[in-house]
């Protein structure tokens, strides 16, 4: 059976395949070519299998597909995620906008705040103290009324981040049940996405998850359907996470997908270097869109709280420095 390892970048998609006889082959194609194909990863796999555009995928032909993708990264950079509404404890509606009040350029008079990913805020009547004791029961009628208004306004994704929600989960769960009954398609709860203290970090990460997960889910379902993963066409479909680990397609979340593409390069660099007994490395990964630089000295370097494209989040990811200086970014044509 065939095995495929796919790196879907901003400019090119690279594929390494192992044939049933053990032979390794490579393939490269443009990541975006809408006139010829819908998705580069699927198209590349079909080309390597020798299938025509309309040919069905034979059963039991693909053993596994492992993929790193920049779909979530691009959606974040281009602000192309799902329209999201934030539900937060009453009195804290501006908290994520205020943030931590960090000012990298202290003396700048013209301060440009990063664009928020959520469009609207609903302040929820409820209150829990730091010990997890309920001070004010959740007003479910108010939540239902507010969510119905947001649903009517076209929102389908909701992020729920309540004060001390990491300690007391019940109020967030009740909100999720109400939102689900109304018809919201994406419901991200802070105690599931980032079950730790600090409401700002927890809220930011929950918003990122609600904003990106629908886009990611649509892409994953598109790939799964094209590879007929549910019908025996592909036995295993896995995606690279920002932390350098793989996860099943059904568990791939927005908050874990930001560095899905570059993280695979770091892991590949380290594995290759170890075969040569090299322990100290600087990685330089120049693609068509951006250049990624990383460092390795015996163990993977990961950050837990970081900022990507002006968005704060708290999720484990590889420490990778990215600059917009890929081959296509720095080269230009002259007659």
What are the roles of these predicted feature ranges?
Residues 1-335:
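N-terminally biased helix-coil "hinge/interface" segments that flank
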């Amino acid at each position: 059976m065939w095995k495929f390892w796919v790196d879907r970048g901003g400019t090119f998609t690279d594929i390494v395949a192992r044939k049933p006889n053990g032979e390794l082959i490579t393939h490269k194609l443009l990541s975006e070519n809408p006139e010829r194909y819908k998705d580069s990863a699927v198209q590349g796999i079909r080309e390597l299998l020798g299938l025509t555009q309309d040919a069905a995928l034979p059963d039991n032909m693909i053993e596994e597909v492992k993929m790193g993708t920049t779909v979530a990264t691009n959606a974040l950079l281009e602000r192309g995620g799902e329209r999201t509404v934030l539900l937060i404890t009453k009195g804290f509606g501006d908290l994520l906008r205020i943030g931590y009040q960090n000012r990298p350029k202290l003396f700048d008079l013209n301060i440009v705040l990063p664009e928020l990913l959520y469009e609207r805020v609903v302040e929820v009547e409820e209150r829990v103290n730091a010990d997890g004791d309920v001070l004010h029961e959740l007003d479910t009628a108010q939540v239902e009324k507010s969510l119905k208004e947001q649903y009517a306004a076209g929102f389908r994704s909701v992020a729920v981040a309540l004060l001390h929600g990491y300690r007391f989960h019940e109020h967030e769960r009740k909100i999720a049940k109400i939102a689900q009954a109304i018809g919201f398609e994406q419901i991200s709860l802070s105690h599931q996405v980032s079950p730790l203290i600090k409401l700002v970090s927890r809220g930011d990460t929950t918003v990122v998850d609600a904003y990106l997960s629908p886009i990611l889910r649509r892409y994953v379902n598109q790939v799964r359907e094209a590879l007929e993963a549910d019908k025996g066409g592909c036995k295993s479909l896995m995606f690279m996470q920002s932390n350098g680990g793989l996860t099943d397609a059904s568990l791939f979340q927005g908050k874990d997908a930001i560095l899905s593409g570059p993280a695979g390069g770091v892991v590949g660099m380290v594995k290759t270097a170890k075969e040569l007994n090299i322990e100290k490395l600087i990685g330089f990964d120049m693609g068509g869109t951006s250049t990624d630089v990383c460092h390795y000295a015996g163990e993977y370097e990961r950050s837990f709280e970081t900022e990507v494209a002006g968005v704060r989040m708290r999720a484990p990811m590889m420490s990778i420095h990215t600059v917009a200086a890929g081959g296509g970014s720095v080269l230009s044509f002259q007659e």
